[in-house]
């Protein structure tokens, strides 16, 4: 199970020296790559196919940002408002901008935000999953398959640490993505949101130099 993706504004060799492969990582699956060159700096079961849980939302966010029109409003459906797991708490028939939904998605890991984006962009969860799989093919992600925008348990929904690292590196090319995943709090007034948001990603609060991601 992949549970986190970390981005750092540091040279990892400056911290651990040349003997980076001796680094101890408790996670079963881990990989470190250079964002620009994609050079693999450390790898531990990085190509194993495993469920990726809410790190799925990295791709949901990336597709949404590349689509553009972040000020468009989507209507929250009953399907979205009643989803299990982590949510923002959006109510059925609420109208939320795409930008705010992105913050709900990545700040709060909101499954309700994920479904609202998926339905607004793809027409349905199934339609959005098709977009996700077409997109991952265009990025050359060979070890991934997507069935949902949020990562709740599905039978054929998986990725690898390596694929998620490549996906994250792509996301970090976009200013909007970097802003969303790299900040701790945002007030309702900044973009005329419906509520304030605080980022639940503990990495941002506990690790100096961290700038995301999930």
Locations of the language-model features?
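Beta-lactamase-like hydrolase cores
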Residues: 2-55, 70-72, 129
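Short, well-structured active-site flanking segments
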Residues: 66-79, 175-183
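Conserved catalytic neighborhood of penicillin-recognizing serine enzymes
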Residues: 84-116, 197-212
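Glycine/charged-rich beta-loop-alpha catalytic/anionic-binding loops adjacent to active sites
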Residues: 39-47, 95, 145-146, 207-208
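Short active-site loop at a secondary-structure junction
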Residues: 42-63, 73-75, 96-104
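Acidic helix-start/capping segments at beta-turn-to-alpha-helix junctions
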Residues: 75-86, 154, 187-188
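Short glycine/serine- and small hydrophobic-enriched flexible loop segments
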Residues: 62-69, 119-122, 166-173
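Penicillin-recognizing serine hydrolase domain
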Residues: 21-27, 98, 124-214
């Amino acid at each position: 199970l992949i549970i986190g993706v970390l981005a750092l504004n540091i040279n990892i060799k400056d911290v651990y020296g040349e003997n980076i492969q001796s680094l101890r990582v408790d996670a079963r699956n881990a990989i470190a790559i250079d964002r620009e060159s994609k050079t693999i700096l450390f790898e531990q079961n990085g190509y194993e196919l495993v469920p990726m849980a809410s790190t799925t939302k990295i791709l949901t966010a990336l597709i949404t940002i590349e689509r553009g029109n972040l000020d468009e409003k989507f209507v929250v459906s009953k399907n979205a408002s009643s989803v299990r797991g982590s949510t923002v708490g959006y109510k059925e028939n609420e109208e939320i901008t795409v930008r705010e939904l992105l913050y709900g998605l990545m700040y709060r890991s909101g499954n309700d935000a994920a479904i609202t984006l998926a339905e607004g962009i793809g027409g349905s969860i199934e339609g959005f999953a098709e977009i996700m799989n077409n997109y991952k093919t265009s990025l050359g992600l060979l070890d991934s398959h997507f069935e949902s925008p949020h990562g709740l348990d599905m039978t054929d929904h998986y990725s690898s640490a390596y694929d998620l690292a490549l996906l994250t590196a792509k996301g970090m090319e976009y200013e909007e993505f970097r802003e969303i995943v790299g900040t701790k709090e945002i007030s309702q007034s900044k973009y005329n949101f419906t509520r304030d948001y605080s980022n639940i990603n503990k990495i941002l609060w506990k690790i100096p130099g961290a700038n995301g991601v999930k």
